[in-house]
Amino acid sequence: MDLDYCIICGKPTTGNLYCSRECHLQDCPGCGSTSEQCSYSKSADLHMLSSQYLDHFRRRSSMPSPSTSSSLLNGFVASRLAVL
Protein backbone atom coordinates (compact mmCIF):
# COMPACT_ATOMS: atom_id res chain seq x y z
CA MET A 1 0.00 0.00 0.00
CA ASP A 2 1.37 3.39 -1.00
CA LEU A 3 1.43 5.68 2.05
CA ASP A 4 3.12 8.61 0.38
CA TYR A 5 -0.19 10.01 -0.85
CA CYS A 6 -3.57 10.73 0.74
CA ILE A 7 -6.05 7.94 -0.01
CA ILE A 8 -8.83 10.52 -0.53
CA CYS A 9 -7.37 13.34 -2.64
CA GLY A 10 -3.94 12.05 -3.69
CA LYS A 11 -1.91 14.87 -2.12
CA PRO A 12 1.53 13.93 -0.73
CA THR A 13 1.62 12.92 2.95
CA THR A 14 4.30 12.13 5.50
CA GLY A 15 3.38 8.49 5.97
CA ASN A 16 -0.24 9.10 6.94
CA LEU A 17 -3.23 7.73 5.09
CA TYR A 18 -4.74 11.22 4.94
CA CYS A 19 -3.21 14.61 4.19
CA SER A 20 -5.64 16.50 6.42
CA ARG A 21 -8.36 16.14 9.01
CA GLU A 22 -10.90 17.06 6.32
CA CYS A 23 -9.89 14.08 4.16
CA HIS A 24 -9.95 11.83 7.22
CA LEU A 25 -13.48 12.95 8.09
CA GLN A 26 -14.56 12.51 4.48
CA ASP A 27 -13.58 8.85 4.69
CA CYS A 28 -14.77 8.37 8.28
CA PRO A 29 -17.50 10.98 8.93
CA GLY A 30 -18.57 9.51 12.27
CA CYS A 31 -15.06 9.50 13.74
CA GLY A 32 -14.30 11.66 16.72
CA SER A 33 -10.75 12.62 17.64
CA THR A 34 -10.67 10.02 20.43
CA SER A 35 -12.52 7.27 18.59
CA GLU A 36 -10.78 3.90 18.41
CA GLN A 37 -11.90 3.60 14.77
CA CYS A 38 -9.60 6.47 13.90
CA SER A 39 -6.43 4.86 15.20
CA TYR A 40 -5.59 3.81 11.64
CA SER A 41 -4.67 7.32 10.47
CA LYS A 42 -0.93 6.73 11.05
CA SER A 43 1.05 4.19 9.06
CA ALA A 44 2.65 2.90 12.26
CA ASP A 45 -0.77 1.60 13.30
CA LEU A 46 -1.42 -0.40 10.11
CA HIS A 47 -0.72 -3.68 11.91
CA MET A 48 -3.81 -2.97 14.04
CA LEU A 49 -6.15 -2.79 11.06
CA SER A 50 -8.72 -5.46 10.46
CA SER A 51 -8.65 -7.10 7.04
CA GLN A 52 -11.90 -5.25 6.25
CA TYR A 53 -10.13 -1.89 6.56
CA LEU A 54 -7.07 -3.09 4.67
CA ASP A 55 -9.22 -4.29 1.76
CA HIS A 56 -11.01 -0.93 1.73
CA PHE A 57 -7.71 0.98 1.58
CA ARG A 58 -6.22 -1.32 -1.06
CA ARG A 59 -9.23 -0.79 -3.32
CA ARG A 60 -9.16 2.98 -2.85
CA SER A 61 -5.42 3.45 -3.26
CA SER A 62 -4.43 0.83 -5.81
CA MET A 63 -5.70 2.58 -8.93
CA PRO A 64 -6.00 6.35 -8.88
CA SER A 65 -8.74 7.76 -11.05
CA PRO A 66 -7.64 9.40 -14.30
CA SER A 67 -8.70 12.81 -13.01
CA THR A 68 -6.63 12.33 -9.83
CA SER A 69 -3.61 11.19 -11.83
CA SER A 70 -3.80 14.10 -14.24
CA SER A 71 -4.33 16.63 -11.45
CA LEU A 72 -1.31 15.21 -9.58
CA LEU A 73 0.78 15.44 -12.73
CA ASN A 74 -0.45 18.97 -13.47
CA GLY A 75 0.32 20.01 -9.88
CA PHE A 76 3.80 18.53 -10.12
CA VAL A 77 4.49 20.24 -13.45
CA ALA A 78 3.16 23.55 -12.12
CA SER A 79 5.37 23.29 -9.03
CA ARG A 80 8.43 22.55 -11.17
CA LEU A 81 7.67 25.48 -13.49
CA ALA A 82 7.21 27.80 -10.53
CA VAL A 83 10.75 26.95 -9.39
CA LEU A 84 12.16 27.96 -12.77
UniProtKB/Swiss-Prot annotation:
<protein>
    <recommendedName>
        <fullName>Extender of the chronological lifespan protein 2</fullName>
    </recommendedName>
</protein>
<keyword id="KW-0539">Nucleus</keyword>
<dbReference type="GO" id="GO:0005634">
    <property type="term" value="C:nucleus"/>
</dbReference>
<comment type="function">
    <text>Involved in chronological cell aging.</text>
</comment>
<dbReference type="Pfam" id="PF12855">
    <property type="entry name" value="Ecl1"/>
</dbReference>
<dbReference type="InterPro" id="IPR024368">
    <property type="entry name" value="Ecl1/2/3"/>
</dbReference>
<comment type="similarity">
    <text>Belongs to the ecl1 family.</text>
</comment>
